[in-house]
Amino acid sequence: MDVPPAPGLFVTGTDTDAGKTVVAATIVGRLAGEGLRPGVYKPAASGGDGDARTLWEAAGRPLDLASVCPQSFRTPIAPHHAAREEGRRLDEALLVAGLDPWRAACDVIVVEGAGGLFSPLSERLLNVDLALRFGFPVVIVDGGRLGCVGRVLATVTAARARGLVTAAVVISQVTADDARTADDPTAPRRIAADGVDELRRRLADLPVALLPHRGAETLPALDWMALASRRPSPRP
């Protein structure tokens, strides 16, 4: 009997440096803590393999680091530009095929994209294209800075227009709190928390979670396995 491929989540951002790796690693840790075997895949990375290593460690080091991120580049720019800068070639077919070793090796796969949902991965492919090919619901992450509501709403709207299922939104506070008090409306924690409240009101059909700065243990408990199994509703 054929074993159905593992379900998965595609963790993406509203922009680069949105806190995707922290969120993805936290989700992976939750899945592992439930006794599941999570797989982790980062199709391409620029700026080194630090993000891939974080995911690999969170998953308990399944397979090997090269399987987590088969294409890693040192230069911190878009992967296909980084490849060209280093005299290498980004293998577009491998972006897709690199997921294959994980499909039968785990119970659920967490993929972390590079940059935002519409950031380029290659000359032709954007992150959104890869999410569609994998068929995984997306987890949209924003760094919780001023403007997070507009960025998230735009990304959710664009994802839906392309036929993607949005599993959840996570506001990951990437800016540390400083000497300002929690009563200051411009304090990072207030901006992030107020953004979550506004998004919960406007996206009543989606889970919207807050991940405080360096507070991975406080990410609200969601059924990530159930969210990974969501599929698009048939169109009329």
Predicted regions and their residues:
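Switch II (G3) loop of P-loop NTPases
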Residues: 95, 99-123
